[in-house]
């Protein structure tokens, strides 16, 4: 079974950890092969961005392991990942790998798992690999379009298809290992009450712009002071 998952951009506007969009600029493609066994998982990476990916602590292996454990299925799995999304540049590359893996494996095994449960598993795999789950990235890659996470327990999301184009600027910079974990250390842990009303207003305008397909309103609401 072969599945493709596209890259994503998250933290749109004031939607920190809740708003993300799938983009067709880059993608990962995952093939899975299963046979009777005891749960052994082998991962193999190739493609333009396959260097320096650990064979043990990667989201393909971790997401497959979580899926097998939660589904109580004992099979051996061979996962081949064509890595077409650059890592460390904020494009949801590790999340896309996890998404393509759980989708391909669930289809190959004939498991009737809904997409939000698959997104949850992919997010948990990212947490194990990088220190924090990115439910916005993985949900966008899995569902497509622009999504807003509105519940974590259970995981739920709204999906939109805004009538516009996204221009993607990818910086050619070297990022540290576990970039997201490093960056989250410098994010403020507390906020002043005065910062809340403008952010809530912009989020309301953002959602309204998505429902009404107003690119002008969406653009006006993208400012984030936090």
Name each model feature, range by range.
Residues 1-2, 39-40, 77-78, 138-139, ...:
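Structural motif
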Residues 1-89, 107, 111-115, 144:
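ATP-binding N-lobe of GHMP and related small-molecule kinases
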Residues 4-6, 22, 141-143, 150, ...:
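Short beta-strand segments
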Residues 9-12, 21-24, 71, 130-133, ...:
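Solvent-exposed alpha-helices and their adjacent loops that cap or buttress functional pockets
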Residues 14, 25, 54-62, 92-100, ...:
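Conserved active-site and cofactor/substrate-binding residues in soluble primary-metabolism enzymes
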Residues 69-154:
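Gly/Ser-rich oxyanion-binding loop with an adjacent helix/lid
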Residues 157-226:
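C-terminal nucleotide
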